[in-house]
């Protein structure tokens, strides 16, 4: 227990120290939100990876999908690396950096408002982002707290409050630069931790080959006379597995907190280097998490919840509980790192969106600050400082709201994530990507995709999820491209000279 406490205290002190160190660079909006658009490839790649993989993945998804699909769940991690990281950086990285810098966009809602010349899109996009990031944040709290209860015996309520306080401190102090620096430190812990944990868990089962053989001997859930499904290449349910891969891999392309990493990177050379770093990070962390979760059935049946469903969130903790204290301490730091980095990214994204796209969207100054229609440098600096203060206040507000949900958590972690990813990526992915590439994308098509992505997700939830939330999210994302394309064919195009000026950044 002493080892676990010491390592955790050191970790928290380092995180807060980085926030204090970075506070001078967080005095302006660009500095607070984007790190001055000068963050290097290593910090950006690790910020992308650590925001991608949190306790939602390590505890929720790895446990649930490892139980359902066995060792074939590893394909989810492979998809996350190839589609969610490699292709995301190749397809979105350069164009996002160039266009957002060219049109002076700081957030995804700001991009929609400027690219499609619609303040209405900007406002609605910011509301969608703010509302649907809350359930994802609550899921992050739930995941880390499950591990803390196992490792320290600390009640769930204390865990979420402690985590929220320390995350708020370093984000409020240092903004994006502090978040990126901490993400790098946390990413190193995650890489080392996942490799060590996999080795320890497999060793407890007699080694890799013995563990795989045990998995091959397990009977199928649908037919007890059939063995081997949980150790096969595609697993017992390949079609639903594909839905999970699409949601968790393609979904990142439309999430504001993920795409925002491309806004802040320094230049095109850094993007090329960051692509490689981010992909390798995802292979190790995501591939490792799902590979580990694939062995969950070797550790007994999980508890049954009052609603009659299995408690999938308990599977990974049950695999780790018999490990030595040092390994458990490493696991706690691993998940704490993953969760705090994701939480920091989420609250920073939400607060910046609310501040820049709702409160200050028309860039108004206070009465008496404008003389003869011009804002001088002193006034402009004053407005910038005020925006940063508002963002810091909203960080506290967002954390409190998500904390209240986390203290009374609905449904499973994976379903929470499925709802938020489905709505956000279903609404944003297609219009964002096509807005970067296709000049004929219309404003009406973006509105249609917002309605499509949010509508299908919410209606499915209100009807009691007749379509699995994971599959519904995948349908929302893929269908969004059809919606944007079809509506763009039959609706009014933007003025050609306006669009050409926006696309000058690629010349």
Where are these regions (language model features)?
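Membrane-embedded helix-loop-helix hairpins and adjacent transmembrane boundary segments
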Residues: 1-507
